Structures are given as C-alpha cells and as structure tokens.
C-alpha cells in the first residue's frame, strides 16, 4: 500500500513524499497510518507539521492535536500497543512510530535519515520512503540538535496512491 504527503515549507509548495507501508508485517500499524493520511475517521495528518527535526537522525511529525509532540491519537483510541519489532531501523528513509515508552503508539511518527539500530525493539517500523528522499534531506537540513525546526514544514495534503 502506498501513501503520500504533499509538503510545504514556510507556506511554499515543496513537493511530494511517497511511502510504502508494510501492511504484511504490521497490518494494524499500517492501517492506522493510512487512515490518518486519508482522514477517513474525521481526523488525521492533513494540515499538521513536522515539529521535531534532528539532522543525522530523523524528522518527527504526526501530532495533529497539539502540534508540539505532546498530542496526537490513533484510530484505535488515544494509544495502541506495539504490534511487533520484526523490522529494524537499518537504513535512511524508514517510517517508524514515535512513542513515550512501551505500548504508547498514537499518531506521531518519524522518518529516519540514518540507520538507527538503538531504536530497534523500542519503536515499530511500518514503512519506507519510496519517492523523494531529496525532500526528506531538505527538511532534515532545517532541523537542529535540539530538534527545533528553522521553518514551518506542513503536510498540506495526504492520502492513498
């Protein structure tokens, strides 16, 4: 299954990032992300921002309730359990669930920009970038060691391909 984000940077269109979701390995996690891309439950990623970007690590987004990393919710309720840790953080461009500890998945996700093996067994990998890693790198360059983002990076539109 493929989904997309149409991104703007400081209000200007920046391009589309496409993802493949690994629904064969983590169907529940993939279904949550897909539904948040389509907005079919009445809420989702459209209009939300990347609130935390750390160069040589990752881009984090998906907090569409508070926008600062403290909010978000899943289609299954506020939080849902870690589905499994079969997939590893072995390369750049992987989609993984952000969390606040075991079994606290909501809507926040991150895109890796380097291999992150220290996250294996703690965060659920559920997809990967299939198109436009160049835009991922551009967004990465707007981050900082603290995670503060130097520009407003927004998911203007998103859905299923």
UniProtKB/Swiss-Prot annotation:
Catalytic activity: [protein]-peptidylproline (omega=180) = [protein]-peptidylproline (omega=0)
The keyword Iron is annotated on this UniProt entry: no
EC nos: 5.2.1.8
Database matches in Gene3D superfamilies: Cyclophilin-like
Primary location recorded for the protein, binned into one broad class: cytoplasm
InterPro entries given in the database record: Cyclophilin-like_dom_sf (IPR029000), Cyclophilin-type_PPIase (IPR024936), Cyclophilin-type_PPIase_CS (IPR020892), Cyclophilin-type_PPIase_dom (IPR002130)
Sample GO molecular function, one term: cyclosporin A binding
Regulation of catalytic or functional activity: Binds cyclosporin A (CsA). CsA mediates some of its effects via an inhibitory action on PPIase.
First-tier enzyme category under EC: isomerase
Protein's cellular compartments: Cytoplasm
Biological process (GO), any one: protein folding
Biological role: PPIases accelerate the folding of proteins. It catalyzes the cis-trans isomerization of proline imidic peptide bonds in oligopeptides.
Protein family (similarity comment): Belongs to the cyclophilin-type PPIase family. PPIase A subfamily.
Protein name: Peptidyl-prolyl cis-trans isomerase A2
Organism name: Rhizopus delemar (strain RA 99-880 / ATCC MYA-4621 / FGSC 9543 / NRRL 43880)
Taxonomic lineage of the native organism: Eukaryota, Fungi, Fungi incertae sedis, Mucoromycota, Mucoromycotina
